[in-house]
């Protein structure tokens, strides 16, 4: 069964098994997601300049990498939301879900901008 799973799915399963359902562990996972989001946001701020200042092949690669990174992080947040739905609700987990949904909304907005850049630049 593991042969058919992607690396992301395997990592998620491992984290899910290691996490259990404790609130503390849930917060650790959420902090990890927020950290990854902040790193993406820093790269995102320089994204328009990267796209404008490179040649065609570099633009395509930049757009592909950013799109892939946006997708992977949004998938991870989706998985986090699904994980929280399986855990007994408490105020900390509900707060994490609200933050997850907010991050997901921002990622979708970023994805829309990437699509506009890719149409303009390619």
Curated annotation (Swiss-Prot):
One of its GO terms (biological process) is exit of virus from host cell nucleus through nuclear pore. InterPro entries: Flu_NS2. The keyword Transport applies. A motif (Nuclear export signal) lies at residues 10-19, 86-95. Interacts with protein M1. May interact with host nucleoporin RAB/HRB and exportin XPO1/CRM1. Mediates the nuclear export of encapsidated genomic RNAs (ribonucleoproteins, RNPs). Acts as an adapter between viral RNPs complexes and the nuclear export machinery of the cell. Possesses no intrinsic RNA-binding activity, but includes a C-terminal M1-binding domain. This domain is believed to allow recognition of RNPs bound to the protein M1. This is Nuclear export protein. It comes from Influenza B virus (strain B/Yamagata/1/1973). The gene is NS.
């Amino acid at each position: 069964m593991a042969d058919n799973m992607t690396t992301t799915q395997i990592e998620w399963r491992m984290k899910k098994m290691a996490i259990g359902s404790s609130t503390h562990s849930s917060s650790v996972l959420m902090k990890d997601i927020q950290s990854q989001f902040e790193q993406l946001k820093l790269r995102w701020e320089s994204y328009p300049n990267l796209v404008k200042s490179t040649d065609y092949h570099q633009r395509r690669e930049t757009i592909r990498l950013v799109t892939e990174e946006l997708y992977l992080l949004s998938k991870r947040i989706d998985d986090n939301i699904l994980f929280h739905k399986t855990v007994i609700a408490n105020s900390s987990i509900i707060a994490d879900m609200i933050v997850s949904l907010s991050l997901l909304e921002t990622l979708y907005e970023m994805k829309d901008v990437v699509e506009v850049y890719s149409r303009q630049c390619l």
